[in-house]
């Protein structure tokens, strides 16, 4: 395991909302929700920390957000402007290193093992970046510093907003043991529920399980979690990383015959894919359905749409059509997945912030 790398994960704090509050003094200190008209079928893209106190969060239906936060200020947002500010932030990153892996408009990994400023400490680099972003752009960022991407990302969320958490190699396992497994990158709702049923709530609980037992219960997630909780992750910061697809899949606890359950899963996946596409500022043209039967036979079907989309309704309708064409209901399903491929950036087009 390589512990010599110096990796920083920078995550802007409530990015879209913070830009709006910076630019519009009347929004400061108030619960601001980016996501459009709460009287229509929309989804929250992000919200200010004032709104989060009421339980509002990203990917939540705007109608639900309005019930939780009746005095919230709802706006559609200005995606073109957020792209512009994101580019300004990345320009600041480039003053320190060229090894930058953007994850979305508001977060990125930086490898500062050899940095342009000649700073020996990654902590100093991270603090300098935070201060530069604040002084030049009037925005706050949180930072995680460690020797690999997995730990750095978890650490950046540890002391939000405007915080920084540093995890040295000798501290990694103790740090990860105290973290709820729901905070582990890559652990979604379905995996979290499985872990909960197994009595695994923290990294310490996870560490008690053998590699074989985790793989048996969680398949590939178990393989990765066994390594992650021990600080083993050597994925490099990849400046040329370009996501080719966005998808979601789940393995059912019990094999499923009922097509209605499969359709419900596809609807949930479509919502999550929409939220991720919005965050990545991309839309796609091809919808892919994946089915794995109880005998482990796996099929994939795809449908190319007439136009690019990041709309959950359109994604779901395409996936449901593929399901009706592919599934007869005679054999039970072990796994179902939905992926949108053939992606391209939205950038200055009118990115849809309203979904389901």
From Swiss-Prot:
Xref: NCBIfam families: PRK02406.1, PRK14133.1
InterPro entries: DNA/RNA_pol_sf, DNA_pol_Y-fam_lit_finger_sf, DNA_pol_Y-fam_little_finger, DNA_polymerase-Y, DNApol_IV, PolY_HhH_motif, Rev_trsase/Diguanyl_cyclase, UmuC
Family note: Belongs to the DNA polymerase type-Y family.
Binding site for Mg(2+): 11, 106
Subunit structure: Monomer.
One matching Pfam family: IMS
Catalytic residues of the enzyme: 107
Species annotation: Listeria welshimeri serovar 6b (strain ATCC 35897 / DSM 20650 / CCUG 15529 / CIP 8149 / NCTC 11857 / SLCC 5334 / V8)
Swiss-Prot/TrEMBL catalytic activity: DNA(n) + a 2'-deoxyribonucleoside 5'-triphosphate = DNA(n+1) + diphosphate
Keyword entries, A-Z: Cytoplasm, DNA damage, DNA repair, DNA replication, DNA-binding, DNA-directed DNA polymerase, Magnesium, Metal-binding, Mutator protein, Nucleotidyltransferase, Transferase
Gene Ontology terms: cellular component: cytosol
Function noted in UniProt: Poorly processive, error-prone DNA polymerase involved in untargeted mutagenesis. Copies undamaged DNA at stalled replication forks, which arise in vivo from mismatched or misaligned primer ends. These misaligned primers can be extended by PolIV. Exhibits no 3'-5' exonuclease (proofreading) activity. May be involved in translesional synthesis, in conjunction with the beta clamp from PolIII.
Co-factor: note: Binds 2 magnesium ions per subunit.
Cofactor: Mg(2+)
Annotated GO biological process: DNA-templated DNA replication; error-prone translesion synthesis; SOS response
EC number from the UniProt entry: 2.7.7.7
Organismal lineage: Bacteria, Bacillati, Bacillota, Bacilli, Bacillales
Cited Gene3D superfamilies: 3.30.70.270, 3.40.1170.60, 5' to 3' exonuclease, C-terminal subdomain, DNA polymerase, Y-family, little finger domain
GO molecular function, one term: magnesium ion binding
Location within or outside the cell: Cytoplasm
PROSITE patterns found in the cross-reference section: UMUC
Swiss-Prot/TrEMBL site (Substrate discrimination) positions: 16
Limits of the UmuC domain: 7-188
Protein name in the entry: DNA polymerase IV
